[in-house]
Amino acid sequence: MAAMAVGGAGGSRVSSGRDLNCVPEIADTLGAVAKQGFDFLCMPVFHPRFKRESIQEPAKNRPGPQTRSDLLLSGRDWNTLIVGKLSPWIRPDSKVEKIRRNSEAAMLQELNFGAYLGLPAFLLPLNQEDNTNLARVLTNHIHTGHHSSMFWMRVPLVAPEDLRDDIIENAPTTHTEEYSGEEKTWMWWHNFRTLCDYSKRIAVALEIGADLPSNHVIDRWLGEPIKAAILPTSIFLTNKKGFPVLSKMHQRLIFRLLKLEVQFIITGTNHHSEKEFCSYLQYLEYLSQNRPPPNAYELFAKGYEDYLQSPLQPLMDNLESQTYEVFEKDPIKYSQYQQAIYKCLLGRVPEEEKDTNVQVLMVLGAGRGPLVNASLRAAKQADRRIKLYAVEKNPNAVVTLENWQFEEWGSQVTVVSSDMREWVAPEKADIIVSELLGSFADNELSPECLDGAQHFLKDDGVSIPGEYTSFLAPISSSKLYNEVRACREKDRDPEAQFEMPYVVRLHNFHQLSAPQPCFTFSHPNRDPMIDNNRYCTLEFPVEVNTVLHGFAGYFETVLYQDITLSIRPETHSPGMFSWFPILFPIKQPITVREGQTICVRFWRCSNSKKVWYEWAVTAPVCSAIHNPTGRSYTIGL
């Protein structure tokens, strides 16, 4: 029937649905809608005017069928092409008890019939402040039966009453709600999903009106689990040729929604009557084809969006060949290392000494040899002589290094199979080069490794990198909170998954404030007593009502002088994909009001066998201290 179905957004094609309030002949309508190019149909499960009475006789026992037969469509069509809609008269949060009780019964009847049909999704309206009973009825429905429908909450981007043009200017308006204006509808949603305990089955169908809110409100919505965007035909403008188009502001919003792979639902009558209705859909296709192309980082990260991974522990574990292979493909990292080594060699060896001064260069953690090759290229580029040691503790990777030496490098490179902290070097190094950084800079124990190796660095020797700093930023993300919650393991503390960091390509999230520096390490470390434990307090101003789910971690490093690498969004090295950000979750989401400050405390702790992080929020409210004593997560020395 249709090329794609509900939940089928992906690839370059826009996935779209048609929203109708009345469907007399379902099979014919579905055929017509598919012909126009739509993938699914949103329609009431029951006739909108067929109000049922569940409480009082005699209407309670009205004869005849309650709604159309399921036999009108095949099971597969119900499963993939129809999104159910709740009858508009159903108001489970009515203050009138009879209406409320009747609505509850009718809502359950419609939800149960939707489950019986196997509908992939059901559309329910959120159009007022108090939706508590709606949340209870829906949550009870989700927890009974074995159905798997998604529930799309239809939320307006801007509340309809805020668009009324009959309000007299400067006249006092009566606001009964705690939040007004742009904040209102997000608070409806936030309170509703909190009541539903962040159920993964409940998502947003965001209705976009002619007026758009400010950018920070849109940014916040894009951190929510938006599965569909509802576009009324009335928001489309008309171009010179009579076709429907959207304003520049709306286009920018559509581009951002396309990145989240939402499905689009067109609602309303044809406002461009001389054109076919499918022209609305064709315009969305046009926008999809003409959106900015993905950059190298986005292409590499495709498929990893919001996918949680445990951080690597290359000190404790030996990496696999494929892991090395992925990192070696990074086009930026090794060219920056080569540039840093090149500059360092020129700085250490004057032109007149280039034939006599041989610099001893040690690659610590050589892996399969990319830094050795970068060093050799740098020496050639600088026209300087070097003697190279490639030190690697992974015996499997050493095999690759020895093959390189035999086939390419020759006597210029000495391969050493040893842990750099235990190696007794035959001579001291002029330059030590390493790539031991993780997504949070020091989380793969670069400080401990380089401190253990610096005794064979000359007093005037150079470490590349010379310095690195971790950064933290507060984020809101329903998606990531639910992903972490789902990581619960059978034999562990039920909240252990919230006490460990995850490497993740952040996608469906909202950053609440700019990243701030956390811990800095410098090499060589000339302190008489080296201590890599740290404690920092960071305060983040927040300009919007929101909810805190955790902290994104990034890093910047100075390789040598002005040669840097960064995954901090503001300074991200273009095209570099070796590191995704790190996520530090918190156990309980924390509501944050506009103008409040988020205060977080971070500790880096260690003993003789391991290193770990602890963290706690202390404003606007206090959280528990996460991961005390490293009980849920440590990094092995």
Swiss-Prot record:
It comes from Macaca fascicularis. A protein binds at F327, E435, E444. Arginine methyltransferase that can both catalyze the formation of omega-N monomethylarginine (MMA) and symmetrical dimethylarginine (sDMA), with a preference for the formation of MMA. Specifically mediates the symmetrical dimethylation of arginine residues in the small nuclear ribonucleoproteins Sm D1 (SNRPD1) and Sm D3 (SNRPD3); such methylation being required for the assembly and biogenesis of snRNP core particles. Methylates SUPT5H and may regulate its transcriptional elongation properties. May methylate the N-terminal region of MBD2. Its main location: cytoplasm. This is Protein arginine N-methyltransferase 5. The active site is at E435, E444. Residues 308-615 form the SAM-dependent MTase PRMT-type domain. Its EC number is 2.1.1.320. The record marks F327 as: Critical for specifying symmetric addition of methyl groups. Keywords: Acetylation, Biological rhythms, Chromatin regulator, Cytoplasm, Golgi apparatus, Methyltransferase, Nucleus, Repressor, S-adenosyl-L-methionine, Transcription, Transcription regulation, Transferase. S-adenosyl-L-methionine binds at Y324, K333, Y334, E392, D419, M420.
